[in-house]
Amino acid sequence: MIDIKLIRENPDLIKGDLIKRGELEKLRWIDEILELDKKWRENLKEINNLRRERNKLAIEIGKRKKSGEAIDELIKKSDNIAKRIEEIEKENNIIREKIDYYLWRLPNITHESVPIGKDDTENVPIRFWGKARVWEGHLETFLEQSQGKMKYETITWKPELHADLLPKIGGADLERAAKVSGARFFYLLNELVILDLSLIRFALDKLIEKGFIPVIPPYMVRKYVEEGVTSFGDFEDVIYKIEGEDLYLIPTSEHPLAGMHSNEILDGHNLPILYAGVSPCFRKEAGTAGKDTKGIFRVHQFHKVEQFVYARPEESWEWHEKLLQNAEEIFQALEIPYRIVNICTGDLGYAAAKKYDIEAWMSAQGKFREVVSCSNCTEWQARRLNIRFRDKPNEKPRFVHTLNSTAIATSRAIVAIIENFQEEDGTVKIPKALWPYTGFKEILPVDKREKCCQS
């Protein structure tokens, strides 16, 4: 939520940012907010004047009572003032509701470094890491996507898509999952179960080393939390509601972690607060019909380790870079080649002031795909959830800044491992960093092994 004081003092800044985001239909909202706010403040001034007048009448009534003078006329006048105050307060409540309607639906103000663009095609790659394995048939598109800034080795055989390789390594059963639950669900099997759990523990260990507190949050939250952390459009497109309950399945542990300190005033000396959330994530994936219909890349349910930070406003941009660095270190340790993308205004989402994505190179698909999202939401979520801090007991509280970033989303990391570490015979090598966690170094095709998890 945006501070109405900022709209009041600098409406052109807000309008300019809405134009950058392509939210042109909301420009008139700013003018309406200003008109409503002006009327609200005029009413408030009148209420205060009427209260002062009524207080004077109360004093006069007291004096006349003592002297035995008539007070009926003064009491009548006082009652009329009280009624007028009540009328204006009701009007102001209606005005406040209208203002809040707009404020709750305005996006965050973007950082000056966010590129202006209409959609994901105008996101800007800013950094590349690793050495990609590139099938010769994908070389031209790879060079275009990597801008010639990434190391690579060419392979002559075409890697299999993860969806095609999954049954060959006994990694998942999507057909039976579709029978039981519908599309975009999966049974994870054999080594991939161990790999999934290993990725969680690996990422968690990395974050614990950096001072993050591990948290398994509630998997359902109340509506006020969802309204506080995300845009209203997500209620239709992303979030599952529990029928008959004021509860929603979490699409990411970011949401319960943001709600964890709602309506609290934090001790500034304890900032930053660093949480590493571990949870399943549940997403409708509405609006993605036809996209990634095979395999486990875009699914309704998956596991994720999430970084979440409550920071001082003056430190939040530094923490944004640190969260990105943490995620990069995880993918570098896994030896998965990637690029960093600065998300443009048209693809940013309402909550974030700036967002980076890490996109892993998918050798079989021949393109980069999102595996990490790293956002600074500044005070947008904190205002909605009323999360403040102060350094001294009598100090006026300030809103914290909230930040979040994927550490690892296991299903997408598994896809990246399968596509980048497969051999021509269908064997999938395990990144060395995971060997102490998995207990095996490769996943053999089903027809080449006797049992699961052979080391």
UniProtKB/Swiss-Prot annotation:
One of its GO terms (biological process) is selenocysteine biosynthetic process. SUPFAM superfamilies: Class II aaRS and biotin synthetases (SSF55681), tRNA-binding arm (SSF46589). Disulfide bonds: none annotated. Consists of two distinct domains, a catalytic core and a N-terminal extension that is involved in tRNA binding. HAMAP family: Ser_tRNA_synth_type1. Belongs to the class-II aminoacyl-tRNA synthetase family. Type-1 seryl-tRNA synthetase subfamily. This is Serine--tRNA ligase.
